[in-house]
Amino acid sequence: ATQGVTLSCLTFYGEYVAMDFRGRQDNICEQILFEHCYGYPLSGEFIRIDYCYDIPRILHCHVNPANMRLFGRTFAAVVDSVIARPTYTYAIDHTDNAQLIDLFTFGAHGGIWLGPDTYGQLTNFNLDCVTVGIYKAGGGTFNRNWQIAQGSIIANVKGCGEGIHPIIISGEGHTAITNVEAFSGGNGALTAEDPQHTNDKGSDNRTFVTCDAIGAVVNGRIPAHLL
């Protein structure tokens, strides 16, 4: 088991996956802290955490292909290749009260994946040029609560799988969303698209959403734009 690790002030160049802390149920990791880390992984996966029960923290991290300018690898074809992979920049599952604060990503299929066996707080984020901004899954009605606030999502690229959506919420649990803005537009650094958002996840009235001006796909027949 990995315990008490801090990764701070790191910059990654040309990596495929930057930081992988996926444990197992019989071999967990705990007290993991990521802060002030930078990069642009070619898989689209910057931080992966699984089975980390003593409060993982991801703070002040920045993922942007501009980090690769030194090597001349910021052209649109590279970014489009990363977007085409069904991955998320930040992905967590099987955690207690995870803290995700001040996160940025650009040019990825997915921004943040919150697994079905997680809960916690996500605040102060910018997810730019993604297919899916946040995918919040829910594995039950007990203690599967996420509070999401103070963020901006630009979902405007054609990746794969779910289609273009600022937020997707599926399964059971509770999600509170406050002061999150979603919008779209072009960007010369990649191939951008801007279709209509649709709701395609089916009905489940055990998923609860509290929203304030946010476009979302919810696991129920709720309009995709909750405005």
Q: Locations of the language-model features?
A:
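Extracellular/periplasmic carbohydrate-active domains that bind, remodel
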Residues: A1-L227
